[in-house]
């Protein structure tokens, strides 16, 4: 399941809340951080970072970039890095676990002028295409802001796309565009309205494409805002409606 949206819409917050709910329901969850700029997702999840990112484990950005260049020169369609794998087979070098909740970072921008994030997109795409999960297992993918991951093909290996829509024109335009792209790729799609109050709910709904399935509505929460400001885990924050959202996805 891929979660996207504009910057500040609450993607990482929703990923964390859904992951916690799934964990408490007895599922095994891996959260994949595909945002090369996000630095604090593990904190709100309540999971320690692993020793290295997946990109580092594969030899670093230079190694992956070299493979991509080789693919272009040979006119191959895509990079092949991974064989078929399960959650249990993933190395503890790049995945950290808190009971049945795991956390994996694809890669991060570490230096000035190090270049684009395309190699990270290629790694994420191939990883998601080769990971196989059981019925009680979930993978939640937290993406960077916008829709660049659509262009990189990251959505290729996911079953469901969720766009987080906060009260802004940018969020509405992005949701409608993402819905169009997801439909072109025959992907299940839904939206979660976030930071909502009664005065704007109907306005927001009226501006979204009428074919978009609204999975749920989450009110603005000062508890979430304070937890995020302090860098605390959202483990103790209660939000109504998460079970209903998961039922819509199932």
Feature-to-residue mapping (PLM):
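Conserved lysine of the Walker
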Residues: 11
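N-terminal phosphate/diphosphate-binding loop that engages ATP/GTP or pyrophosphate donors
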Residues: 23-98
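Conserved catalytic-core segment of NTP-binding enzymes
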Residues: 17, 119-217, 225-226
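Residues in the short beta-alpha loop(s) of Rossmann-like NAD(P)-binding domains
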Residues: 35-37, 195-197, 221
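Cytosolic-facing regulatory segments adjacent to core modules
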Residues: 79-94, 102-139
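Hydrophobic anchor at the beta1->P-loop junction of P-loop NTPases
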Residues: 3
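C-terminal boundary of histidine-terminating zinc-finger modules
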Residues: 228-239
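Walker A (P-loop) phosphate-binding loop of P-loop NTPases
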Residues: 7-8
